[in-house]
From Swiss-Prot:
The gene is ND1. It comes from the Eukaryota. This is NADH-ubiquinone oxidoreductase chain 1. It is a multi-pass membrane protein. One of its GO terms (molecular function) is NADH dehydrogenase (ubiquinone) activity. Belongs to the complex I subunit 1 family. It comes from Artemia salina. The chain crosses the membrane at residues 45-65.
């Protein structure tokens, strides 16, 4: 950590070190100075790729764990899950996402106007598959 010369360990340089410091030989050619600074940037890519690898391993582990711990679905249970549960949830997502945008519209029916929960009657019917 101390070799990175970052905030806890960045030592103040004196005036003699500014004119005759360790960076003096790199100031005449910018290629050498750029190579020194680019060598420190590889740590960011190593850190990013290691975090990406850890996340990838966690996803693969959770996938394999769920496959190994749950029993196989019967075909009729799978069809019930897809058609009765997932299908209704997937098609209700746009209804609930667009509900805040439709709240400013006035209802023209005088019997439904200003009645509580009148806007959610259609959502309940859609959710029940009616």
């Amino acid at each position: 950590l101390a070799e990175t010369n970052r905030t806890p360990f960045d030592l103040a340089e004196g005036e003699c070190q500014v004119s005759v410091g360790f960076n003096t030989e790199y100031m005449h050619s910018s290629v050498g100075f750029a190579l020194i600074m680019l060598s420190e940037s590889e740590y960011a890519s190593i850190l990013f790729m290691s975090l990406f690898s850890v996340m990838f391993c966690l996803v693969v582990y959770s996938y394999l764990w769920s496959r190994g711990s749950y029993p196989r679905y019967r075909y009729d249970n799978l069809m019930h899950l897809c058609w009765k549960t997932s299908f209704t949830y997937i098609f209700n997502i746009p209804v609930f996402l667009l509900k805040p945008f439709s709240s400013g519209l006035k209802n023209k029916d005088p019997w439904l106007y200003n009645q509580p929960y009148s806007a959610f009657k259609t959502d309940a019917l859609i959710g029940q598959g009616v």
